[in-house]
Amino acid sequence: MRAAVVTKDHKVSIEDKKLRALKPGEALVQTEYCGVCHTDLHVKNADFGDVTGVTLGHEGIGKVIEVAEDVESLKIGDRVSIAWMFESCGRCEYCTTGRETLCRSVKNAGYTVDGAMAEQVIVTADYAVKVPEKLDPAAASSITCAGVTTYKAVKVSNVKPGQWLGVFGIGGLGNLALQYAKNVMGAKIVAFDINDDKLAFAKELGADAIINSKDVDPVAEVMKLTDNKGLDATVVTSVAKTPFNQAVDVVKAGARVVAVGLPVDKMNLDIPRLVLDGIEVVGSLVGTRQDLREAFEFAAENKVTPKVQLRKLEEINDIFEEMEKGTITGRMVIKF
């Protein structure tokens, strides 16, 4: 079967791979779609360590074609996800308190184990979340990581209906954060970016205000918008240093800043302001299986509509080049 494999020179090679036989608790999935995430770019570039030889992909959707004898949670024909949180231990303090993404023994698809950019994938059956029948599978691929990540981040922000939430970076993650916050949580949205096309897209999605941080002072604009109060919360999907600092600068006292993007640079935080204004900066890592089920359901109810563009597996290196240039709006999804 064909698979997108990380090479030593930080490229991706389309190679033939042979899968082993299933072990107890596993299922074999025929991949239909796999979204391309910025984390895949980090993995390819060895930003988190050298994983030469691994098959990329953690936004996979496909149908079960085989199950091990002991599997009861899945059956042949089920449409399921292959997500970043591939498997956790199920026994530690995190797994037993609804925080399984923080498990110290967690396995991650497309990083520590082979992922979904392949024609077939072996999954741990209990961790393959079923996709609602009403949800388009190509759209579901985007929800599997980008969707659940931003849905969880918006939940972590504690934003309430009618409050102001700022979303920094309106790419594959940011556009979904905007939709979950607006259409599910009932928040008012300010979209921040330096790309006018992405900001126009944010306006189409229902953003109450858009701010090009390159052309104007985002702090001054927010103060005008909120009668000098500041935003109630921000979610940062950008991977650049400047927007993260701006996300702290635009919030009010007692607000929460949620970090989602994974910048390579170290951040500069104004600690005195955090202390004096009681501002919380928290990280939010993808989502649990329950978060993913909820994220899928909201998408199936058309409250969230991922913008996807279908591509071929052979185009994966081109997609990464476009990603590095910042020219992608929405999500690139590989169709198998």
Swiss-Prot record:
Residues that bind Zn(2+) 2: C89, C92, C95, C103
User: Could you cite one Gene Ontology molecular function of this protein?
Assistant: zinc ion binding
Metal-binding listed as a keyword = yes
Q: Which cofactor does it need?
A: Zn(2+)
The lineage's top-level taxon is Bacteria
Pfam families linked? ADH_N, ADH_zinc_N
The protein's UniProt keywords, in alphabetical order, are: Metal-binding, NAD, Oxidoreductase, Zinc
List ligand-binding residues for Zn(2+) 1: C37, H58, C145
List its EC numbers. 1.1.1.1
Free-text cofactor note: Binds 2 Zn(2+) ions per subunit.
Q: Which reaction does it catalyse?
A: a primary alcohol + NAD(+) = an aldehyde + NADH + H(+); a secondary alcohol + NAD(+) = a ketone + NADH + H(+)
Question: Which protein family is it in?
Answer: Belongs to the zinc-containing alcohol dehydrogenase family.
Q: Which NCBIfam families does the entry mention?
A: PRK09422.1 (NF006940)
Q: What is this protein called?
A: Alcohol dehydrogenase
Q: Which gene encodes it?
A: adh
